[in-house]
Amino acid sequence: MSNTVWILISILLATVGAVVGFFVRKSIAEAKINGAANEAKRILDDANREAEALKKEALLEAKDEIHTLRTEAELEIRDRRSELQKQENRLMQKEENLDRKDETLDKREQMLEKKEESLVARQQQIEELESKVGELVQKQQTELERISNLTREQAKSIILGKVENELSHEIAAMVKESEVRAKEEADKKAKEILSLAMQRCAADHVAETTVSVVNLPNDEMKGRIIGREGRNIRTLETLTGIDLIIDDTPEAVILSGFDPIRRETARIALDKLVQDGRIHPARIEEMVEKSRREVDEYIREVGEQTTFEVGIHGLHPDLIKILGRLKYRTSYGQNVLKHSMEVAYLTGLMAAELGEDEKLARRAGLLHDIGKAIDHEVEGSHVEIGVELATKYKEHPVVINSIASHHGDTEPTSIIAVLVAAADALSAARPGARSETLENYIRRLEKLEEISESYEGVEKSFAIQAGREVRILVKPDTIDDLEAHRLARDIRKRIENELDYPGHIKVTVIRETRAVEYAK
């Protein structure tokens, strides 16, 4: 019974609690709803107020922007109106200018029409005058022909002849003046170049002989050199082609011969025989052959050394060997190899001054006398032989022409060829370069004066400057100026044909007229 009551009471209390909780929750919910509604209303009111403010602000901004745009539009319209006004003014001004130009052109056209009418009238007047002048000229020509007995063509020919003669004299005078001026300038420049080349080129005074001396340890060696019945000396002379002179000269044997290479071969062979002490025909033959090989090798070395000193490269080996043989060749006592090197240096220096190829100039100068190395072995002049050698070994055409023209046998085709000829003459003619015997020297001077004085009208002649110039004084009553030129040419030809001399000889004919009066 009590449990049931308690259950009922519990149920009742639970029910009452549920009802009370329901109402409490309801009241709380209503309160929340009311608060939310109030909050929503407040938010809505705030939003409405903010929207109203934004609306007002937007309206104000829109009004400001509309005002700004309106102002800019008005300014742009004003500017466009101003620009249009300016364009309109310019167009009006151009129109006015065009109107003025039209007026000016109309005036000019009228003036041109007037001038054209005037020119037509003048042309008619000129034609009338020309017709009258032509008639007058024809009358004058007819009258002149009648008076002078000359036709128009004859008179024209005479006048043209006089004019041509006057012009030819004037042209000749101008040409002569130009030639004199050019010659003076060329001579001055040539002297400067030659002086510079000579100052920069140091050359030796050359003196060569045709004999060699072999020193002996004692005079008993002379008998051994001669051998039994002279067989040793005959063998040596036969193999070398050199004369052995054994005289009273103590402890010396003289080798005489005009071929320096054979003389050098004999000297070396005899030196070796004397040092060896075994002198008999077989040994002599062996030593001579060995000496020939040594001389050939020495000649090759000399050729190579020469090309190195001169600064030339690319020569054919055979040509180098032939070049070395020039060491044993002389011309009027001047060593040909030294002479060729001197010509090479001079040609190179002058070519450098003129802006030509210096190396090619040196090459041409060094090889200009290459034919002299074998001219005693091959038929022909040294110029012809040199040209053949240069052609055979494919030298430069300028080098070949320089060899061919350095003695005037052919015309030079390049400046270098002319320089080679000048350097050759300069090297040969300088003092001390070439030598002659005293007898030949005196005989040549006497012959120079004899040739000069053999002509009629020559008063006296003098050979000066060691025979390199001859001055001839002539009688002015017998020889005039033109005859003096002819006399100089004739004497020059006779000297070239009758005398043998190194370098050049200058022939000067002097004609002097003196007028003397005495005042009393």
UniProtKB/Swiss-Prot annotation:
The keyword Zinc does not apply. GO terms for cellular component: plasma membrane. Residues 210-273 form the KH domain. It is a single-pass membrane protein. Its EC number is 3.1.-.-. Pfam families: HD, KH_1, RNase_Y_N. Its main location: membrane. The keyword rRNA-binding does not apply. CDD domains: HDc (cd00077), KH-I_RNaseY (cd22431). The chain crosses the membrane at residues 4-24. GO terms for molecular function: RNA binding; RNA endonuclease activity. Residues 336-429 form the HD domain. Disulfide bonds: none annotated. It is an enzyme of class 3 (hydrolase). InterPro entries: HD/PDEase_dom, HD_domain, HDIG_dom, KH_dom, KH_dom_type_1, KH_dom_type_1_sf, Ribonuclease_Y, RNase_Y_N. GO terms for biological process: mRNA catabolic process. Keywords: Cell membrane, Endonuclease, Hydrolase, Membrane, Nuclease, RNA-binding, Transmembrane, Transmembrane helix. It is found in: Cell membrane. Belongs to the RNase Y family. Endoribonuclease that initiates mRNA decay. PANTHER family: RIBONUCLEASE Y. This is Ribonuclease Y. It comes from Bacillus cytotoxicus (strain DSM 22905 / CIP 110041 / 391-98 / NVH 391-98).
